[in-house]
């Protein structure tokens, strides 16, 4: 481990909140970059395959981030600046999914809203898999239902 003085850290960040924001942003950016590299390679484009690939890649990349994401959500609820900052990062994620869809012929009305709903559904699978598992739910059946719902939503 490299030793870094507190003074060095605070020369880049004004306080602990900025350190947390910078660390979370770097962490989420690295995961998102990997996700989009995978999704950009889906060719030839087929919506059903894209959605299944999106779900699998998202679960693989984000499932280990459950604890960090819970901590970040708690910070977002307590601090308007953090909330606004990470809302902007989420918007980039939604826009990138919409961009991939648009580039591949998906030009439906209300695409942004449909992408947002789809992202929430995909993330609910991550939560179920890694953080808030419910007894009595068949995860594979749930995953199939989410995939079918997202494909249908993005096809309308």
Give the positions of each predicted feature.
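Amphipathic alpha-helical segments used for helix-helix packing
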Residues: 59-81, 127-132
């Amino acid at each position: 481990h490299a030793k870094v003085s507190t003074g060095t850290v605070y020369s880049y960040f004004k306080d602990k909140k900025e350190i947390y924001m910078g660390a979370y942003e770097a962490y989420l950016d690295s995961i998102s970059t990997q996700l989009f590299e995978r999704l950009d390679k889906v060719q030839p484009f087929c919506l059903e395959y894209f959605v299944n690939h999106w779900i699998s890649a998202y679960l693989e990349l984000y499932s280990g981030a459950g604890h960090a994401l819970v901590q970040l959500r708690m910070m977002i609820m307590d601090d308007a600046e953090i909330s606004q900052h990470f809302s902007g990062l989420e918007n980039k994620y939604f826009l990138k999914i919409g961009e991939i869809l648009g580039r591949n012929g998906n030009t439906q009305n209300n695409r942004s809203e449909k992408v947002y709903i789809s992202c929430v559904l995909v993330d609910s699978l991550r939560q179920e898999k890694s953080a808030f598992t419910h007894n009595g739910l068949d995860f594979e059946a749930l995953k199939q239902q989410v995939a079918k719902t997202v494909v249908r939503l993005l096809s309308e």
